[in-house]
C-alpha cells in the first residue's frame, strides 16, 4: 500500500441511483463465503475456466479492505482504533455503493449490530444480502486451520463476545490487506443476521449448498432477483467443484490464505467434526451456541438431551437476571425519590442489598433490525 493516503473526492452524502447499491455475501469466517463468490464468478464468466488469481482481483471486494478505509478517511488505516473502524465501516459501504454505477457484490464477515453505539451496517445502501451459515462444529476445525489455532482456542474465539478477527502481532496486522473485523461470537453473528425477518436477506446453509447444490444456489440466485436458468446455475456449479478448486490452489496457491504453509480450501466437508473434535469439545461448542444451533438443525441427535439442559439452564439464568435488573431499578428509583430536597431524611442514602450477577449486560454488540433502516 502506498504511504500517501488520498481521501476520495466522492460526495458520500449524495443519494444512490436506482441501479446502485450493495449485494452483501455475509458469513462467519470459513462458512463457504469464498466458494459462493467463486460460484458467482463462474456464473458471470460462462466461457472461462476458474482462474484463482483473476478471481481474487476481479470478483467482489471486502468492506474491510484497508484501501477503502484509506480512501474514505485519507489516513493510514493501520492507525485506526477498533471504535474508529466500527464508525467507518458504514461509510466504507456507502463509498463502495456510490463508486460503482451498478450494484456491487461485497464480501463481509462483519457482525450486523452495534459497537460502541455505532451501527455496523448502512442498510440504506444495501439492496440484498446472502447470509451463509455453517455448523459451528465444522467451523471450529476449519477456522483453527485458517488462523493457525488449536481447536480449544478456536472454540474459545468463536464463543467470545466483542471478538475481532485480526492477526496476533502488530507487524502482521500492519501487513494484512484488511483492517480488524468485528465478528462477535458465532451466535451473535448468526443472531444479528438472521434474528429478524427481512425480505432482502436470503439465508442458506452451507450443508444445503454441499448436498443439494444446484437447487440451493438457484434459490440464492432467485433471492437476488437474477435472471439465470437452472442450466446456467448447474454449469457454474460444475466449474466450482470443490475438488477442482483444491487442485488449482495446490498448483498455483491462493492470495486469501493467511499462512503460507496452510490450505485455504481445506476439506469443505460436512460432519467432519465427528473425526476431529472430542466429546468435551463438542459439548463446549453446544454449551455456547445451543439456541442458534437448534434454530438451524445443527445439534447432533446424541447431544439433544445435553443441549436441552443447556437451553433450560440458560433461560432460567436469563429469568433471574431480568428479575434482578427490575429489582435493582426499583430500588434505585426508590433511593432517588427519598433523596429529593424537602423530603424527610433528605440526603440520607439507606443501605440497600442490590442483587449482583457475574453476567455482564448489555453486550457490546446488539442486533439491529434491518427493516427499520
Task: Annotate each predicted stretch with a short phrase.
Residues 1-203, 268, 276-306, 318-323:
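PAPS-dependent sulfotransferase catalytic domain
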Residues 50-52, 225-235, 245, 300-303:
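Short, surface-exposed acidic
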Residues 1, 308-373:
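Non-catalytic N-terminal targeting/anchoring module and adjacent flexible stem/linker
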Residues 237-289, 313:
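PAPS-dependent sulfotransferase catalytic core
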Residues 26, 197-224, 272-276:
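Phosphate-binding beta-loop-alpha motif at adenosine-nucleotide cofactor sites
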Residues 211, 230-231, 279-280:
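Alpha-helix N-capping/helix-start residues
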Residues 39, 139-142, 219, 223, ...:
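Generic recognition of well-ordered alpha-helical segments
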Residues 219, 223, 227, 288, ...:
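C-terminal alpha-helix
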Amino acid at each position: 500500500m502506498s504511504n500517501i493516503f488520498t481521501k476520495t473526492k466522492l460526495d458520500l452524502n449524495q443519494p444512490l441511483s436506482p441501479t446502485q447499491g450493495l449485494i452483501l455475501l455475509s458469513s462467519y469466517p470459513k462458512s463457504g463465503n469464498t466458494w459462493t463468490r467463486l460460484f458467482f464468478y463462474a456464473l458471470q464468466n460462462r466461457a472461462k475456466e476458474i482462474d484463482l488469481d483473476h478471481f481474487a482481483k476481479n470478483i467482489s471486494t471486502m468492506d474491510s479492505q484497508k484501501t477503502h478505509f484509506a480512501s474514505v478517511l485519507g489516513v493510514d488505516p493501520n492507525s485506526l482504533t477498533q471504535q474508529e473502524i466500527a464508525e467507518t465501516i458504514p461509510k466504507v459501504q456507502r463509498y463502495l455503493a456510490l463508486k460503482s454505477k451498478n450494484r456491487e457484490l461485497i464480501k463481509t464477515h462483519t457482525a450486523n449490530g452495534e459497537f460502541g453505539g455505532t451501527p455496523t451496517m448502512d442498510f440504506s445502501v444495501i439492496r440484498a444480502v446472502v447470509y451463509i451459515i455453517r455448523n459451528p462444529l465444522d467451523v471450529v476445525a476449519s477456522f483453527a486451520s485458517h488462523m493457525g489455532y488449536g481447536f480449544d482456542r478456536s472454540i474459545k474465539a468463536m464463543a467470545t463476545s466483542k471478538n475481532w478477527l485480526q492477526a496476533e502481532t502488530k507487524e502482521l496486522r500492519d501487513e494484512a490487506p484488511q483492517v480488524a473485523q468485528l465478528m462477535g461470537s458465532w451466535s451473535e453473528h448468526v443472531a444479528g443476521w438472521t434474528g429478524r425477518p427481512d425480505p432482502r436477506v436470503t439465508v442458506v446453509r452451507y450443508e444445503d449448498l454441499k448436498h443439494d447444490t444446484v437447487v440451493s444456489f438457484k434459490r440464492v440466485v432467485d433471492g437476488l432477483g437474477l435472471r439465470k436458468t437452472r442450466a446456467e446455475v448447474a454449469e457454474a456449479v460444475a466449474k466450482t467443484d470443490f475438488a477442482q478448486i483444491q487442485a488449482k490452489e495446490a498448483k498455483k496457491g491462493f492470495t486469501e490464505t493467511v499462512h503460507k504453509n496452510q490450505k485455504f480450501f481445506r476439506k469443505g466437508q460436512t460432519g467432519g467434526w465427528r473425526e476431529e473434535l472430542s466429546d468435551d469439545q463438542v459439548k463446549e461448542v453446544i454449551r455456547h451456541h445451543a439456541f442458534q444451533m437448534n434454530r438451524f438443525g445443527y445439534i447432533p441427535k446424541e447431544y439433544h438431551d445435553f443441549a436441552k439442559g443447556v437451553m433450560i439452564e440458560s433461560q432460567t439464568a436469563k429469568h433471574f437476571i431480568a428479575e434482578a435488573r427490575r429489582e435493582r431499578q426499583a430500588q434505585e428509583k426508590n433511593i432517588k425519590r427519598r433523596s429529593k430536597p424537602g423530603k424527610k431524611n433528605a440526603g440520607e442514602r439507606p443501605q440497600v442489598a442490590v442483587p449482583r450477577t457475574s453476567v455482564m449486560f448489555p453486550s457490546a454488540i446488539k442486533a439491529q433490525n434491518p427493516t427499520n433502516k
